[in-house]
From Swiss-Prot:
Gene3D superfamilies: Catalase core domain. Its cofactor is heme. It comes from Oryza sativa subsp. japonica. This is Catalase isozyme A. InterPro entries: Catalase, Catalase_AS, Catalase_clade1/3, Catalase_core, Catalase_haem_BS, Catalase_immune_responsive, Catalase_sf. Optimum pH is 8. Optimum temperature is 30 degrees Celsius.
Amino acid sequence: MDPCKFRPSSSFDTKTTTTNAGAPVWNDNEALTVGPRGPILLEDYHLIEKVAHFARERIPERVVHARGASAKGFFECTHDVTDITCADFLRSPGAQTPVIVRFSTVIHERGSPETIRDPRGFAVKFYTREGNWDLLGNNFPVFFIRDGIKFPDVIHAFKPNPRSHVQEYWRVFDFLSHHPESLHTFFFLFDDVGIPTDYRHMDGFGVNTYTFVTRDAKARYVKFHWKPTCGVSCLMDDEATLVGGKNHSHATQDLYDSIAAGNFPEWKLFVQVIDPEEEERFDFDPLDDTKTWPEDEVPLRPVGRLVLNRNVDNFFNENEQLAFGPGLVVPGIYYSDDKMLQCRVFAYADTQRYRLGPNYLMLPVNAPKCAHHNNHYDGAMNFMHRDEEVDYYPSRHAPLRHAPPTPITPRPVVGRRQKATIHKQNDFKQPGERYRSWAPDRQERFIRRFAGELAHPKVSPELRAIWVNYLSQCDESLGVKIANRLNVKPSM
């Protein structure tokens, strides 16, 4: 396949206006009418084409992460990690891989303010020599739920009320009162890190647990961490109101202007590594995306650096049509049995097929830079030039053959088919430890934000009591302080 065989490009622009089919247009100022004041004629093909195309310029926005901005650059491996993965782009220090990165807010629509208290997306597409690898994460290391079957529900709860189209936290607290594992993410959302100053000054995390595989099929669980070299910076509530009131696209503009000025954002990539044979020594499940791995027990290991040194050439082509999916992995990197990750592998690719069409991976920004070949043919908006006679496998008339075997962990999976939750939940320990690590003024800001949302008149007394009980199990003094603000009696 050769995606560059023929590609319409602005580099072929003519000096005069034409129709989409290339015919010259001699007047793009007036419609064709009967006389200077007469009715417009339907035979004015250029007018019809121009208006019809304008009416179809917008495509469905992402159901989540609709508001975002992209930039291009490279990833450089800086440390030898061949003892834990056979991924080619991590083959040796100094190896560089082109990337495109998209930062985003999560819940609100395209064009919404970038100062809203909301998780931020941090998605990286690596154009490796063995295909594209997409690492999708957030600026928080944990998520609200641990099972993908509840993903539509948690997004519905955070999205605006379907009656009023206003985001209301009573809906969030109602739904997540059934999911105490969500507490840990609330201790990031309502913390000072809940509103990053901009995209350049925020951490990134893979959130889910992935698997590194070596050439001899040795598997290890990994979590990914992006650390900005310029440090982490966040907006306080009053600052966010001021910044958002002046410019609702402040983070997008900051990213674009910084790169244009030669102030290239940079992040260091680290991994935490756990041998699956040792996972039972932890008091939590390493495949639970509502948990972090303690760095004193599982230290960060440096891998490489990410540098963004080019702005996108066209926002629509390289941001709106940019499509990520955790199902895109390369040899040496694989999924784990993390229930959220398993669901995301299907969901992200499916939403791209709906949003962009079945051939979304043919779009230049999504297509691999390496040579590739399969028998996926035709479909809506297929623009791949192909001249093969054989579109099946195997065939004695075509040279297509299987690639060399990719190392896959031989670990057996044994169990009964069942719908069940994980055994080691331990939902209150880590949020409590995080709260107690803060200075008193930071604790007070968290209490004010959390209690302020719980004070919504549609949050029932029963619901407030449930959340006070949860918070008390994280930290008894925290529960008492929240209860006093809400006039709720804490219970343990």
